[in-house]
A protein has these predicted regions:
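Conserved alpha-helical scaffold segments that buttress catalytic/binding sites
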Residues: 2-232
Length: 232
């Protein structure tokens, strides 16, 4: 694997930490099944560029928190043409990062990348809980003839038997998605966007306590979720 220099990578760090806590940023600008506007392939580059304007000093902890972990940023790879092949490619990259005892932080790209990431984790942990912050359920079994479409991302994650999902902010889904959701009460819990004022975060904590958990954050959820999560 090839890495960017600390100054050109995520956050533009002035120096490397000597901490044993290791994080690896994986830029993966996938754009294969977008159904509205294009440009997801430029996401990782834009995030990394914007991150260079972030203050490194943490005003809550009153310290340079970035020194508490070693952060590497992978050099972007050439993504394979077929969607399924691209997901296998990403799964392989995440697996190599996990084998280096690093925590992977993946920047997309359209959100069909999720099952590729989860495949790598599912092989290394007995059970995983995904925290999904999203406006869409993404539980379709396929969309526009594509099984691995962005609209099917969470459905494909549930193809792995050791995966559970806790979702926040969902406000868009079709009837087939809702029918499927009703069949998996032990594997998925949705905190609906319409019920945001009544969300019980103690219930949420119980759902993920003592579990291996990963987060999937989709920007279209932020308008309805961000303030509520911050206040909680």
């Amino acid at each position: 694997m090839t890495f960017l220099s600390p100054l050109s990578g995520f956050l533009g760090l002035p120096k490397k930490s000597k901490s044993k806590n290791q994080v690896c940023v994986i830029p993966f600008g996938l754009e294969k099944s977008v159904s509205y506007e294009s440009g997801t392939k430029n996401g990782p580059k834009a995030i990394i560029k914007a991150s260079h304007q972030v203050e490194l000093f943490d005003e809550e902890l009153l310290q340079d928190s970035y020194l508490n972990f070693q952060l590497d940023t992978l050099k972007p790879v050439k993504i394979k043409k077929k969607l399924n092949d691209a997901l296998e490619q990403l799964s392989g990259i995440v697996t190599r990062v996990l084998n280096r005892n690093q925590f992977p932080l993946i920047f997309g790209g359209e959100h069909s990348i999720t099952p590729g990431i989860i495949k790598a984790f599912s092989k290394q942990y007995k059970k995983i809980t995904i925290l999904q912050i999203d406006a869409h359920a993404d539980l379709r079994d396929g969309y526009d003839g594509e099984k691995y479409s962005h609209a099917s991302a969470m459905r494909r994650c549930l193809d792995f038997p050791n995966i559970e999902i806790v979702s926040f902010g969902i406000r868009n889904l079709c009837s087939d998605e809702y029918k499927y959701y009703q069949t998996i009460p032990k594997r998925m819990k949705i905190f609906w966007g319409k019920d945001m004022k009544n969300w019980n975060f103690n219930h949420f904590k119980k759902l993920i306590k003592n579990k291996n958990a990963g987060m999937r954050l989709i920007h279209d959820a932020l308008s309805s979720v961000a303030n509520r999560v911050r206040l909680a």
